[in-house]
Amino acid sequence: MAEINHLIPHFLHFEAGVPVDDLTRPLEEQFATARRRGWSDDPDDPGGKTMIGVTLDTYRTYCRRKGYPVPTPQRLRDMTFATWRDILKTLYWDRMGADGIHSQGIANICVDWLWASGPGMTKRIQRILGVKADGIVGPKTLAAINAADPTDLFTRLYNARVSYYKGCKAWWKYSKGWMRRLDAIKPDGSFTIYGERIVPRTQ
């Protein structure tokens, strides 16, 4: 089964510029590096204030779901690895039912799409699979994922993401970064960054 910790180094590199040489270090150490690099408030980015890929709106959604106080931008900047990882798991990994996906590569490309483009991407994924596009990943969606040939499904998901990105207004500005991130994800669950194959550790 897919494992969430295998995906984390990919996120820390592309959201916060953690160097390739550091991506096989313990995850807590990678996150410490990411915290020093991961703050963004780009006026062209509709996400606004963002810490290691987590927008303030996303953090508010997470805190509301958990019953936590309404977060401030400073709390967003100060979030711990445990909180950041739980946001990834609660709002994206679990939304995709990724603990039930057999292929790490398929889990990676799906969850990364939800993270990058919003939870609504579950419906696009379901359309690719030919199941009811209700945005709820249940037993039928997971069965379709796991019954598909992983290489073929990965290719279809990859092509769908490229098509989606080309339709985004910000394609002109972010296309190179978006494609570099997508191209790093490999069907076997590894990542290739600057020509180097990365096999993530699990802790």
Predicted regions and their residues:
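Cell-wall polysaccharide-cleaving catalytic domain and substrate-binding groove, primarily
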Residues: 1-203
